[in-house]
Amino acid sequence: NPKLLIVDEPTAGLDPAERARFLNLLSELGETSVVILSTHIVEDVTDLCPTMAIMNKGKVLLTGRPMDAIAELESQVWRKQVEKSELKRYEQDFTLLSTRLVAGSPVIHVFSADRPEVGFERVAPDLEDVYFQRLRQHAKAA
């Protein structure tokens, strides 16, 4: 067993069954070795890593346990399905974390301590929300 294993995007291109098998293998290796996992699949980090770092352009924006980072955003992530024509307004008026097309309609996640406006529902944050919140926070500070 190696003492250190570095893997870069190891699950990219794998089908779901192979991805699960490989993640289980990495988890087992992590019991006796240090595994450094570089990935853009945040779900893999949440499921696999006891400690993580979020980096952007070579700069470390956050280190810690994934669940602790997620807990910091508790009660501050809001979701709403909007019209494509309204996206620009939401980008200007709110701290937009992400936009995802669901059945052709944009669904946005907004970071806010309070309900941004009528129609938003509070959702449980995930590591993707943490990632985008840290990127936006870093961009504002720069």
Segments predicted by a language model, with ranges:
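C-terminal coupling/interaction segments
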Residues: 98-142
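Catalytic Walker B motif of ABC-type/P-loop ATPase nucleotide-binding domains
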Residues: 5-9, 14
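ABC transporter nucleotide-binding domain
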Residues: 22-109
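Extended interaction regions within the primary functional domain
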Residues: 1, 8, 117
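Helix N-cap at the start of a conserved alpha-helix in ABC-type nucleotide-binding domains
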Residues: 16-18
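A short, proline-enriched helix->beta-strand linker immediately N-terminal to the Walker B motif
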Residues: 1-3, 32
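Residue-level recognition of hydrophobic positions within alpha-helical transmembrane segments
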Residues: 14, 40, 124-125
